[in-house]
């Protein structure tokens, strides 16, 4: 492999035409577009019914997170007068466009539910019953259920000078009730708020004797129907559900705090009540009530979304587990397992191991840590943890290793978004077991996926390494596509050793032999390799780049790709989510093709391939080509050195996905995605299906 120093970097003057805002797609709008592609899976009759339901719920969950993080960041940029994005849009213009595009997505989500999935479930013998369709027996049972199970935990709050507008928790279900009459103290009724505690199930299953084994109702329907029982002697003139979404980005000045864990715990207490960014309301909510809510949440009209159904569609995902009909789900997949996982050290000493999850079982990674925990020759284990899931067997193995006398160091990233609380608990648990826990580097999230095992073999110490594109999380390893490399390569082992020195100590920047690392060499390394392909093409020789990742928005990388295309480099980008690069622009990106794959498994692997004048380089990484990953995180990018394994990655992860004509969406120069379909002379090909069938 070429050394980094031999790769000159492109230099762009300020007046570079490749900075033209017209050449860039807005990142927020591109991210929203991904959710339309997910929702399209919910509309596909070829997908099993409950999986379609799951895809709809995923699109809703994604939209929630989009507002909590991305839209909140744009609103922050607007408030502080930050400059336009590379696409030239001002924060205000972005917010307006977000509202219009998100409103379209919400409309499609509810039409998908009301007009497609709900009737299809009914045809399959699964009833999700609206309150106007309840029989008298069902209504009597639900009234009793309300009185016995729901009413005791509700605390309705009247709105008057003594009872100001209550604090409303982020994404919680609430009912605003319009009242007429006077209460026991002679107070005139007007408005009240009923908050539904999260302890209550959002979907209630009716007994089989009331019409069948698989009939369900929404909690919101039950609350709206029987809310009058909370206000005896008052007349309920209307009950309208609403849900507010709040900014959920934690703000901790890491350079000022003395104890990051303590500061995060304090922030988590207030996260559910931070500034509002979106208000979802019942379709028939009167204008005067809408104005009251907007005033109390500090929002304007472009934050309002009227919905035709329950305000939290993603809670319908509960049906996926409640309904016992395997024929309505994807058939189970049995992943490949290593033939000799018991001797994983001996196997790895002979040759590198490459795993393509979920088609290859994640148990091989777990077995590696378990064996290290009990192997008397293992002296030390070092690992990074970003997301692990509940009841992690990997964490159990690390604790066992510490109790067995191994020197165990774990870098726990406390700021993993929405896993902060779980990771704080994880850090406490590891420390109690004697594990040395560090929290990474101030100002940089540790997103790298690294495991280092130091083992005595005869008179020498040998390093075994696992590097991955995905988290040490058994759950996501079954649902996400990722690459794992297990190797005993001495250079890689030393590089990983140096990285852990940086993370756990105060070591200076060190030169790595094999790995590229954010925030130091990965950005320049990618730019340098793109520039090398540009020079090769300019010399009249074939040049090509293929890269697969989750998202692309780093402006220097985009400009370098444009320049490479202008020189004649053939570029294929497989980007699941947001992409700010505009392909197919005449004279700029004619030679760039962008596609997104959306299928059964979430595409999560990051793979970069450079033709290198006939001596190709293959890399896998924890990083996307995003500003945050390349410049503000600790990330690793590792080479696949074994030629046969590199060919396998090319075949399975790159060419296989470029051949997909069933789950692929192709991006055009106008920023619009088009679903790929087999041509009349093409055989249908699904990349994920081919991998499940063993290619």
Residue ranges of each PLM-predicted region?
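Cofactor-pocket helix-loop regions in the catalytic cores of large enzyme subunits
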Residues: 550
